[in-house]
Amino acid sequence: MPLSVHHHVALDVVVGLVSILSFLLDLVADLWAVVQYVLLGRYLWAALVLVLLGQASVLLQLFSWLWLTADPTELHHSQLSRPFLALLHLLQLGYLYRCLHGMHQGLSMCYQEMPSECDLAYADFLSLDISMLKLFESFLEATPQLTLVLAIVLQNGQAEYYQWFGISSSFLGISWALLDYHRSLRTCLPSKPRLGRSSSAIYFLWNLLLLGPRICAIALFSAVFPYYVALHFFSLWLVLLFWIWLQGTNFMPDSKGEWLYRVTMALILYFSWFNVSGGRTRGRAVIHLIFIFSDSVLLVTTSWVTHGTWLPSGISLLMWVTIGGACFFLGLALRVIYYLWLHPSCSWDPDLVDGTLGLLSPHRPPKLIYNRRATLLAENFFAKAKARAVLTEEVQLNGVL
């Protein structure tokens, strides 16, 4: 097997293994936190963690099942029967099965001297779905739970060891999910080269530094006004949902699924930027950044005016504002640096070893298998590359949604 193909296959296996370990680690950490809260008599905190965990799991399995049923039956001929897959999703094990199946696909190709184009393309197809589901899971479950834990810490004035573990792992996990999703989208467009190490590091850092202050601002407001944070969330969520509806998204195979997607995207936009439609993205990204920044400033200012520079728990609000502001502007600077100098937006035509996937060369024959979901998102994210990318209509003709 050529070295480049072997590296591609090995990467799929590693991604599948990391996804499985991350899923299990998050589950163990959540259940550990629930047990600790119950032992401390904090039943409301334990219930909130379980509610967040449950609703995220249900939505994740629902997305996974809708995508499976939308795909042609012959595409997943190596998977389990449809009734058994339905049972796995009902038991909340659909995402875990996807990770295991993706890793199995990669391992099976490791024993082939020269994997076929179809096998390599199918491995990419599975990896793209896993990356999208992991991103959804990060914002449906990890981000709200991280906000809850930070609010608890701010209320109590101290953090237990399991809380510090959850906070650090959640911040890193969410930022990694954003990076992995961004990298996976580039495999859908022939004119987009893959991210290098320096570009990946800067992309990871600016997402971490911009997301952190936003979550901390919401957590601060939640700690000070625990009965009003739900009203704040639903108010902004409705505004963001209306904004998404105006953009006319077309991601899911039917209208009901599309509204589920819009509801989920509105939740993600409450915390971070996510491009949901085609066209030039810079204007929408700037509008969203100003909107979220203004809202975060309003949340912090309200907490400051009502409680002064010290929270009832004894934590210095001035210290939190200083650190959060520094992180935000550093993250904003890194974001500008990334898109000005490190964003690989040029078109290139590399020499490829025979038998490799050939995703980046516009002169190679079209792939036999396309992930239409990821291709649509990639065309939205990389608007300039859409003209050189595989057209959505051509993807549909290939029979893969």
From Swiss-Prot:
Effect after changing residue 141 to R: Abolished ability to promote phosphatidylserine exposure
Extracellular side: 30-47, 180-200, 245-258, 306-313
Alphabetical UniProt keywords: Apoptosis, Cell membrane, Cytoplasm, Membrane, Phosphoprotein, Transmembrane, Transmembrane helix
Cytoplasmic compartment spans: 1-8, 69-158, 222-223, 280-284, 335-401
Disulfide bridge partners, by residue number: none
InterPro entries in the cross-refs: XK-rel, XK-related_scramblase
Phosphothreonine carried by residues: 356, 375
Tissue expression notes: Widely expressed with higher expression in testis. Expressed in the bone marrow and mononuclear leukocytes in the blood; highly expressed in thymocytes and lymphocytes. Expressed in the mature retina.
Localization per record: Cell membrane; Cytoplasm, Perinuclear region
Domain of life per record: Eukaryota
Impact reported for residue 35 to A: Does not affect ability to promote phosphatidylserine exposure
Phenotype for residue 305 to S: Does not affect ability to promote phosphatidylserine exposure
Impact noted for substituting residue 356 to A: Decreased phosphorylation; does not affect the phospholipid scramblase activity
Effect caused by changing residue 361 to D: Mimics phosphorylation status; does not affect the phospholipid scramblase activity
Transmembrane segments: 9-29, 48-68, 159-179, 201-221, 224-244, 259-279, 285-305, 314-334
Subunit structure and binding partners: Interacts with BSG and NPTN; which act as chaperones to localize XKR8 at the cell membrane.
Protein name from the UniProt record: XK-related protein 8
Gene: Xkr8
